[in-house]
Regions:
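Short, well-ordered beta-strand segments in beta-rich or mixed alpha/beta enzyme
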Residues: 2-8, 35-64, 85
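Short amphipathic alpha-helical segments
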Residues: 11-33, 66-71
């Protein structure tokens, strides 16, 4: 189960520091990892992919009040776009 969150931030470095501080909360809810992506045209456009073992754990994390506070403190300036997804295939290609 993954949660894909896209939003714009005021300043990537300031946002990233808060994102890193919030890792303990993600782990507390069972998160097993994440990936971060920055927009090519706008490096303050962030896509965060968070991995959870179950939908219930992902939902509990999304409902945690500290998440909204962290997003505000990190300088999120747009309404987040959230996609919930279940992995169906992951394939790596060798050069």
């Amino acid at each position: 189960m993954i949660i894909i969150v896209q939003h714009k931030v005021r300043d990537y470095d300031a946002w990233k520091a808060v994102f890193d501080e919030h890792q303990a909360v993600r782990k507390q809810h069972g998160a097993t990892g994440h990936e971060l992506y920055r927009g090519l045209q706008d490096p303050n456009e962030i896509t965060a992919v968070n991995h959870f073992p179950s939908k219930e754990q992902a939902e509990a994390f999304a409902a945690d009040p500290s998440l909204k506070e962290a997003m505000e403190r990190g300088g999120v300036i747009s309404e987040p776009r959230i996609t919930w997804a279940q992995e169906t295939e992951a394939v790596g290609y060798k050069a």
